[in-house]
Amino acid sequence: MTDLPRDPRHDPVLLDEVIAALAIAPGERHVDATFGAGGYTRAMLAAGAEVIACDRDPDAIAGGEALVAEADGRLTLIHGRFGEIDRLLAERGIDAVDGITFDIGVSSMQLDQGERGFSFQKDGPLDMRMAQEGESAADWLNRADEYEIADVLYHYGDERQSRRVARAIVAARPLTRTSELASVVRKALRHPPGAPKDPATKSFQAIRIHINRELDELVAGLAAAERVLRPGGRLAVVSFHSTEDRIVKHFLRERSGGDAAGSRHRPAPTAAARAATFETPARKVRPGKAEEARNPRARSATLRSAVRTAAPAWPGNSMKEAMSC
């Protein structure tokens, strides 16, 4: 079934560009490692692929059951972390795939649900956990000291006034609602109402990345993709934050034989050269003005893609040890 209708309500960022990078041939097996609302998966199915879709959010998996029914046996949903996609596939007897796609960060579906605690525009419990496991945003913000909070805001949100915001958060504790946190950040930054970009944007992003250990997950996911992509398989990664994009850029540069030194997210090069596991990456792709106007979230998106070679995957996870906050 290649005539599966496209649902514009679920169109993710850079959809056409991702599908072009994947160059899907009918019958190929592709992984949508961040299922979300199913936008990439739907397009992969429409191109004739068999799709294995993964998400750590149980609500996303539950919401995808209707699409499974439409897909005539070509869609499998897996609840799990994309950093473990190689293990999740192996448990199902799959050792190689033709393509893997990552859409890093929070989904529009999660932002639209105020009760999930991701949005500064909708009031809800200060949660931000994608899988409802571990420490919530409220738990962390109400126990962490000012310096730890400031470091997270600076490194994961590029918030230049992180110290000011952290002091305001500590002074306002306890915080339990997203509206409370958003108000504290706005007041700390003295940003006028109606400004083009909400001043709470960076802080909410940084806290979410920290709570869900998203950079660690990205590092693990890239290494897992290297292990399960067949020779000629395609990798496509859409990121929304400068640190995420740097991790992807340096991973592909190193794995394609380039020099990835100079980043705090990478270890020093080893003496023994390893065979390139990816061809030279395609040029990065950014959204056009029309997509940015249609979807403001697209403004910060970057797509990077590359094709797998026949070289064996590098041993271990050479980036994981370098990731820390």
From Swiss-Prot:
Region forming the signal peptide: none
Region (Disordered): 256-275, 281-307
Entry's Gene Ontology BP terms: rRNA base methylation
Segments passing through the bilayer: none
Reactions catalysed, as given in the entry: cytidine(1402) in 16S rRNA + S-adenosyl-L-methionine = N(4)-methylcytidine(1402) in 16S rRNA + S-adenosyl-L-homocysteine + H(+)
EC class of the enzyme, as a word: transferase
Keyword Transferase: yes
Pfam families: Methyltransf_5
Enzyme Commission code(s) on record: 2.1.1.199
Gene Ontology terms: cellular component: cytoplasm
Cell compartments where the protein resides: Cytoplasm
Keywords per UniProt: Cytoplasm, Methyltransferase, rRNA processing, S-adenosyl-L-methionine, Transferase
GO molecular function list: rRNA (cytosine-N4-)-methyltransferase activity
Residues binding S-adenosyl-L-methionine: 38-40, 55, 82, 103, 110
NCBIfam families: 16S rRNA (cytosine(1402)-N(4))-methyltransferase RsmH
The family this protein is said to belong to: Belongs to the methyltransferase superfamily. RsmH family.
Function in brief: Specifically methylates the N4 position of cytidine in position 1402 (C1402) of 16S rRNA.
Name the UniProt record assigns to this protein: Ribosomal RNA small subunit methyltransferase H
Organism: Sphingopyxis alaskensis (strain DSM 13593 / LMG 18877 / RB2256)
